[in-house]
Amino acid sequence: MLKVTTAHIHFNRDNTPVSEQFDDIYFSTADGLEESRYVFQEGNNLWRRWLQFGENHFVIAETGFGTGLNFLAVTALFREFRTQYPDSPLKRLFFISFEKYPMSCADLRSAHQAYPQFNSLAEQLRQNWLQPIVGCYRFHFEETVLDLWFGDIADNLPQLGDYMVNKIDAWFLDGFAPSKNPEMWNENLYKQMFRYTKPAGTFATFTAASAVKKGLESAGFSLQKRKGFGKKRECLQGFKPLNAEQNPAVHTPWLLSRSATLSENTDIAIIGGGISSLFSAISLLQRGANVTLYCEDEQPALNASGNKQGAFYPQLSDDDIHNIRFYIHAFAYGQQQLRWAIQQGIEFEHEFCGVALCAYDEKSAVKLAKISDYDWDTSLYQPLNQQELSEKAGLPLPCGGGFIPQGAWLAPRQFVQNGFAFAQKCGLKLKTFEKITALSQSEKGWILHNDKNEQFHHETVIIANGHKLKQFTQTARIPVYSVRGQVSQIPTSSQLLKLKSVLCYDGYLTPADQAKQFHCIGASHVRDCEDRDFSLQEQQENQAKIQLNIAEDWTKEVNTADNLARTGIRCAVRDRIPLVGNVPDFERQADEYRNIFNLRRRKQFIPQAAVFENLYLVGALGSRGLTSAPLLGEILASMIYGEPIPLSEDILHCLNPNRSWMRKLLKGTPVK
């Protein structure tokens, strides 16, 4: 079940929200805000610890988001701390929270009315509130980052994964009373908490129930009781002892992501110039990194990111649940980042017009029927009949299909180039006509060698150069391939102007641009081809596809005869999901893991996968770069900084650059 189940609540005489699922109040009827401050902020000694904290970020995890009151209160407190102590090394707060039954937006607004001091934060929270499927969603509140996990904590907490072992500084052990919600308060929860908590990390909770106390002690926490809030006699707080096991077992060391070794200067180079480079740079700049981009062209966005119009929507697979989940989470984060870009004044043509998916033949009809079986929230996907889909498109269609109401088109080249101009104002150093031909390691990081025999030294390097990903010796064994795609630009007409949404069949057609002059139609798909010359055959095929798949009179006005087109080379991978993370050392992994099949079978020690330290990549975005790049850039920046990653571990494993080798090695098949 992917769909999020919302909470059923009512407000009692004190105007306190009450859960009908658990028959319990969300917070104290006396004063919910003061309870939050007393139990969780004071119970974890947050202010004192922040004053003494020597790291860049602090991580809080919470077991029940509810109305978000704890989050709003601690975000306000952290803003006060940053205002009073701007020179503190502590710059960012991460708040991870789990919620099985999120409130409706209307109920959330009603609950927030009691706390007008948080109006601005609460409004920002509600703007991005309900999401279509379970899993992790990241939201930015300036120096505070919220990772909100919708769904059962029993399923989601383990998905923090090996990467988050010993990374959480404080726990807000909240949620409905143990007597009302015994499924959450259990031994599994306490063991997971202990595994993720840093040595000397703390927890605080409103309850002092005997079963909770015993469970936390059994997991390894040191406990103490203190006076409870209001009428409660006692509550609990505690910590993970410093002498606790420092290196708990890693379940999948061959897929474990590694953070970078960073100096105070945090000097990072990006090799590329497309949309994945842009969002990697933005996420790093927001963390205060010194970022230099090396682009081999005269300006960014001259290859796969350079089209005049492109579609923004998730790739919905009918046979790969991890693929579906990744793209839906990427789509949600991408929407948030597009709104952010607009707020920042980054200009680009766009239209949130929706995307119509046509069941144009038997195969596509079967695929869309399978996709419809997932029982999506209608905000994400709507199965429609012929008449309904035609109404969404604004033109008659010969078939039904599906509709993605929050889909859009935007101008990729304009967006990427103006995005980089904005990034330069934020400190990005942009070097054009810099063709990096080789990478070599040094004592302090990496040396970039260009085609003019010059060298550039950087601490950390990200390879984001699209279809040229394999050009370096370190990435030569990554199993990606090139795909040539030609997009045709066609003049509009009286009929084509009626098109209201992006239309997808065995190709796609965009609505008219904002000047109402042209549409984009495409794209050809020629594997293992890097020739960018104009192809008359592909131009004619782009026209023929729509006239064959959508056999309506209006498609006769689609005319590619002007031979206006643009060709780009995409980077793709067989399993249709991008690559992001550490660059794996193929030679060492092939050697060290040659017997991993037997090591697992015998339950023997398996070392972490060999990678090139401080070298990362993002690639194989295929035809969905507009959708996936924002989340991939944020994942990469989080990984480099050792921060929480906004994605379930099982999906993150599917993005790992060494995944294809490991599938073979884990089966006992050698790789060559």
UniProtKB/Swiss-Prot annotation:
Cofactor(s) in the UniProt record: FAD
InterPro entries referenced in this protein's UniProt entry, alphabetically: FAD-dep_OxRdtase, FAD/NAD-bd_sf, MnmC-like_methylTransf, SAM-dependent_MTases_sf, tRNA_MAMT_biosynth_bifunc_MnmC, tRNA_MNMC2, tRNA_S-uridine_synth_MnmC_C
Pfam family, one: Methyltransf_30
Principal location: cytoplasm
GO cellular component terms given for this protein: cytoplasm
Reactions accelerated catalytically: 5-aminomethyl-2-thiouridine(34) in tRNA + S-adenosyl-L-methionine = 5-methylaminomethyl-2-thiouridine(34) in tRNA + S-adenosyl-L-homocysteine + H(+)
Region (tRNA (mnm(5)s(2)U34)-methyltransferase): 1-241
GO molecular function: flavin adenine dinucleotide binding; oxidoreductase activity, acting on the CH-NH group of donors; tRNA (5-methylaminomethyl-2-thiouridylate)(34)-methyltransferase activity
Known EC number: 2.1.1.61, 1.5.-.-
Disulfide partners: none
Keyword terms of this UniProt record: Cytoplasm, FAD, Flavoprotein, Methyltransferase, Multifunctional enzyme, Oxidoreductase, S-adenosyl-L-methionine, Transferase, tRNA processing
Region (FAD-dependent cmnm(5)s(2)U34 oxidoreductase): 271-672
Cellular localisation: Cytoplasm
Protein family according to the UniProt entry: In the N-terminal section; belongs to the methyltransferase superfamily. tRNA (mnm(5)s(2)U34)-methyltransferase family. In the C-terminal section; belongs to the DAO family.
Protein name in the entry: tRNA 5-methylaminomethyl-2-thiouridine biosynthesis bifunctional protein MnmC
Source organism (scientific name): Mannheimia succiniciproducens (strain KCTC 0769BP / MBEL55E)
Gene: mnmC
